[in-house]
């Protein structure tokens, strides 16, 4: 499913989408769509997994789920990541992300 330039797929009842993280930003926020994924600015530096934790916490808040339901499938040490949201389908995630895109 494509929403505002972001591809969200569904695998085994979980939504999966890509993102590009921009660490060391002035504030943490979703800043729109980027190359088929979500662009997100993070205050945290990419040290000791801090930026990954902040990324999961931000999306947990936006999607109204526990951060334990978010998993970084790929890109833990990269700016380009693939995120899985357990318990939410692609359509639900699309509706919740739409205001930020």
Swiss-Prot record:
Organism in which the protein naturally occurs: Chlorobium phaeobacteroides (strain DSM 266 / SMG 266 / 2430)
Family: Belongs to the UPF0235 family.
Superkingdom assignment: Bacteria
Lineage, broadest ranks: Bacteria, Pseudomonadati, Chlorobiota, Chlorobiia, Chlorobiales
Pfam families: DUF167
Descriptive protein name: UPF0235 protein Cpha266_2081
InterPro entries named among the record's database cross-references: DUF167 (IPR003746), YggU-like_sf (IPR036591)
GO cellular component: cytoplasm
């Amino acid at each position: 499913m494509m929403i505002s330039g972001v591809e969200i797929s569904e695998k085994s009842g979980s939504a999966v989408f890509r993102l590009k993280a921009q660490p060391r930003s002035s504030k943490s926020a979703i800043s729109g769509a980027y190359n088929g994924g979500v662009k997100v600015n993070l205050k945290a530096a990419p040290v000791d997994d801090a930026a990954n934790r902040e990324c999961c916490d931000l999306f947990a808040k936006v999607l109204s789920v526990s951060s334990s339901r978010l998993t970084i499938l790929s890109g833990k040490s990269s700016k380009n990541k693939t995120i899985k949201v357990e318990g939410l389908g692609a359509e639900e995630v699309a509706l919740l992300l739409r205001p930020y895109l």
